[in-house]
Amino acid sequence: MTDKQIKIETLLPFGPAILKTSIPSYVVDNLNAHCDETLADEQKLKDYDYSGQLAGNVKKEFKLSGEFLNKEQNFSNILRKLAERMIAVDVRGTEEQLGVSYLRNAPPSTTNIAREYITGCQVLTVWCVSQWGGDFNPLHIHSGDLSGVLYLKVPEGLEEEYKNEDHHPAVGDIEFITGVPQAFSRNSIKVSPKVGDLYVFPAWLHHTAYPFRTKDQERRSISFNIIYNIDQEKLKNEKMLVDKE
């Protein structure tokens, strides 16, 4: 039997999904302009400071204003589309039920949530991470159902730093980690940031951002948390009918 006669199908059904897309440059420019404005204003930095709520060893982390996000509907629409995609059949499989461990805001009295009960999603918080040489984000998770990161600026020196790394290069990378190492299975993936790249992943997925050494250059990103909206009344009524039966 020849190699051509042997048809092999690869199945990789396990593990969390990570969605990736590229954001239009004009959206990146709008977000950068807003971040530049905040970074240049000490009072705004103080008013919108978010570092106390985050795990990062980063000097400047601040929330984006609600007023700006209401105007920047293109970014919000992209996030909503990605949230819809995350629970699509071709990503989550054909099962009708989504586990409560995935939808953290689901009622505690239920064990599973069907897609029909999900009515949309809500972006909870959006913040900017202005990272400089030596700054890093230790291994952590987020709150909500989904989280994500969008890269707005990447130091030009990262590529050269990568070339100089002779052992497991990771400068400036983000790494996603789940489970434990096993034969024939990977439990982590590293991604090098590129301007305009946006990643969305389950909020429970551990991840870390590595430091870099390049001086006087910024690695700027936007992070966010999303929850799914659930029709609690419909779920409650239908559960009561099931219980009575």
Mark where each language-model region is.
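Non-heme Fe(II)/2-oxoglutarate
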Residues: 2-116, 134-137
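Catalytic core of non-heme Fe(II) oxygenases with the double-stranded beta-helix
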Residues: 117-200, 210, 217-218, 228
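Double-stranded beta-helix
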Residues: 225-245
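Short beta-strand micro-motifs in enzyme catalytic cores
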Residues: 17, 218-222
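Short, charged beta-turn/beta-strand-edge "cap" motif at the junction between a beta-strand
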Residues: 205-208
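Short, solvent-exposed secondary-structure capping/transition elements
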Residues: 92, 157-161, 235
